[in-house]
């Protein structure tokens, strides 16, 4: 008789401690009073084990949810109820009169002899009147759970499958002709099948497992093994191997000499470059002698003016913003530069710088006072400047009242100190100090008494003068004086410029 209930789907309530199990009956042992379920569900969740066994003493309530028949599975109502007590196993099947299919509990017999579960033929022979409402509510909990599980499985399947979208649920899948189609179906089942018995409930803890791995110990063990075996060591995490740039020589070089320039007289002030090279300052007399000897060897005033103008214009273009400011997209925002030049050689250097700036699409306004007689160098530079789009003015009233982008100061000359008392000079200094634009001084002299225009940057030629704080940040430009010319005036010289023509200097 126990074999008649094999294959039935039941629900077993084992109390609050063990919970509720559902599954298909796989074995019933009347001697040991046990029942086994295959593919069980515990509280609605599929168990990881394929089969579970229950003792009669642990079962509080047993429901028969489905009894298989010879023609297929027959669905019964929700009211198949069985109680298993410590003394025996009993079963009572019935439907309530109101047609809702509620469960009716009755205590089991107190007899010590085990009672057999009635045959399924007896249950079939009972005449049970089921209303249409009962037929709509006749699906059991396991049926609904199995349907939801099958729907979730079909959701995980590929959505472009014809079998899961277009055919009727009870319709068989049409077979494809040919051996190849059968092989493809087998491969699809192997790839997309859901016959997974055990699904882990928790995700893999990557961080926790990574923390268990001691990298330092493993690398140390590898390094020890390689040192013992004589193989090349790949290093340990605490070691930082020496790395060389693509342009760096891996061979050891001679010690670096930072003091490559020496002057014959005492140095009042020293500077250093970004690479650490020491650049001493020279007095105005030494600097004047150096330029005179260079001019005697062919570095004429015209060449010096051209080199000074190129280097000064390059520095000015960088200060104006470089390629970020001077590009075709900013044609409507041309930078404006005001040049303040005196009637001397230093003023001619400023005019040369203004010409190069005007050639680079910079709006240049040149101030130069009117004099009856001008130097030849100034006349030549003015002739070239007039061929550009730059503007030349001789009155301070013609200078812009709004702040410009940059002011270049070339008013001062140590040989023409008397010019500082001129009204135009004082007016130009006052205009530059009132204007909020930064000031660049080209080849400024050393003032015993600080006066005039305070510069933000100063550009020295060849070697710097001992400039004070009023000169701002000092830059040095290469005007093309050969090394032997330095040696001729008693200066041991080695170029500190490297690949540049203008370099910054820092106070040593």
UniProtKB/Swiss-Prot annotation:
SUPFAM superfamilies per the UniProt record, alphabetical? YjeF N-terminal domain-like
**Main location as per UniProt:** cytoplasm
- Where is this protein found? Cytoplasm, P-body
Q: Which InterPro entries match?
A: DFDF (IPR025762), FDF_dom (IPR019050), Lsm14-like_N (IPR025609), Lsm16_N (IPR034107), Sm (IPR047575), YjeF_N_dom (IPR004443), YjeF_N_dom_sf (IPR036652)
Q: Cross-referenced PROSITE patterns, in alphabetical order?
A: DFDF (PS51512), SM (PS52002), YJEF_N (PS51385)
Q: Where are the transmembrane segments?
A: none
Against Pfam families, the record matches this protein to:
Edc3_linker, FDF, LSM14, YjeF_N
Entry GO MF terms: mRNA binding
Q: What residue spans carry the region label Disordered? A: 95-192
All residue ranges annotated as the Sm domain in the record: 1-68
Annotated region (Required for interaction with DDX6), positions in chain = 191-296
Keywords in UniProt for this one? Cytoplasm, Phosphoprotein, RNA-binding
Region called Required for P-body targeting and interaction with DCP1A, residue ranges:
1-79
Q: List residues of the YjeF N-terminal domain.
A: 283-487
Ranges of residues in domain DFDF: 192-228
List residues modified as Phosphoserine. Answer: 131, 138, 140, 161
Record CDD domains: LSm16_N (cd01737)
Q: Name one GO biological process term.
A: deadenylation-independent decapping of nuclear-transcribed mRNA
- UniProt entry tagged with the keyword Repeat: no
A single Gene Ontology CC annotation of this entry is: P-body
Protein task = Binds single-stranded RNA. Involved in the process of mRNA degradation and in the positive regulation of mRNA decapping.
Query: What does the subunit section of this Swiss-Prot or TrEMBL entry state?
Result: Homodimer (via YjeF N-terminal domain). Forms a complex with DCP1A, DCP2, DDX6 and EDC4/HEDLS, within this complex directly interacts with DCP1A and DDX6. Interacts with ZFP36.
- Tell me its family: Belongs to the EDC3 family.
Q: Read off the PANTHER family from this record.
A: ENHANCER OF MRNA-DECAPPING PROTEIN 3 (PTHR13612:SF0)
Q: What is known of its domains?
A: The DFDF domain is unstructured by itself. It assumes a helical fold upon interaction with DDX6.
List the protein's name: Enhancer of mRNA-decapping protein 3
């Amino acid at each position: 008789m126990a074999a008649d209930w094999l294959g039935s789907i039941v629900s077993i309530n084992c109390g609050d401690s063990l919970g509720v199990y559902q599954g298909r009956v796989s074995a019933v042992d009347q001697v040991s009073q046990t029942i086994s379920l295959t593919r069980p569900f515990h509280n609605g969740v599929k168990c990881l084990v394929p089969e579970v066994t229950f003792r009669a003493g642990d079962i509080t309530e047993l429901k028969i949810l489905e009894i298989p028949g010879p023609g297929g599975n027959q669905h019964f109502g929700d009211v198949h109820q069985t109680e298993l007590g410590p003394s025996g196993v009993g079963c009572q099947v019935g439907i309530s009169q109101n047609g809702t299919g509620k469960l009716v509990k009755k205590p089991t017999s107190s007899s010590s002899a085990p009672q057999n579960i009635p045959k399924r033929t007896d249950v079939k022979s009972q005449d049970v009147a089921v209303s249409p409402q009962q037929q709509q509510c006749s699906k059991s909990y396991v049926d609904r759970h199995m349907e939801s599980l099958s729907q979730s499985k079909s959701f995980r399947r590929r959505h472009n499958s014809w079998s899961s979208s277009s055919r009727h649920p009870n319709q068989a899948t049409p077979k494809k002709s040919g051996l190849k189609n059968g092989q493809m179906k087998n491969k699809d089942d192997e790839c997309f099948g859901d016959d997974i018995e055990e699904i882990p409930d928790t995700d893999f803890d990557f961080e926790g497992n990574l923390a268990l791995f001691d990298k330092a110990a493993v690398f140390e063990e590898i390094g020890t093994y390689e040192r013992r075996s004589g193989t090349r060591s790949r290093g340990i995490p605490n070691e930082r191997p020496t790395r060389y740039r693509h342009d760096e020589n891996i061979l050891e070089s001679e010690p670096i000499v930072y003091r490559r320039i020496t002057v014959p007289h005492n140095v009042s002030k020293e500077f250093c470059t970004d690479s650490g090279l020491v650049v001493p300052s020279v007095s105005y007399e030494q600097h004047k002698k150096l330029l005179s000897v260079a001019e005697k060897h062919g570095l004429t005033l015209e060449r010096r003016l051209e080199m000074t103008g190129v280097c000064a214009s390059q520095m000015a273009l960088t200060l104006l913003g470089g390629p970020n400011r001077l590009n075709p997209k900013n044609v409507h925002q041309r930078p404006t530069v005001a040049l303040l030049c005196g009637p001397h050689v230093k003023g001619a250097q400023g005019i040369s710088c203004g010409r190069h700036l005007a050639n680079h699409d910079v709006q240049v306004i040149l101030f130069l006072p009117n004099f009856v007689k001008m130097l030849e160098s100034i006349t030549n530079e003015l002739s070239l400047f007039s061929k550009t789009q730059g503007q030349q003015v001789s009155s301070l009233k013609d200078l812009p009242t709004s702040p410009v982008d940059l002011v270049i100061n070339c008013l001062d000359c140590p040989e023409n100190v008397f010019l500082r008392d001129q009204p135009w000079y004082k007016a130009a200094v006052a205009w530059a100090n009132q204007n909020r634009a930064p000031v660049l001084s080209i080849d400024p002299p050393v003032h015993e008494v600080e006066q005039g225009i305070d510069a933000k940057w100063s550009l020295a030629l060849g070697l710097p003068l001992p400039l004070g704080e009023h000169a701002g940040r000092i830059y040095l430009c290469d005007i093309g004086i050969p090394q032997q010319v330095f040696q001729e005036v008693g200066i041991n010289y080695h170029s500190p410029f490297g690949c540049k023509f203008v370099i910054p200097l820092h106070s040593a």
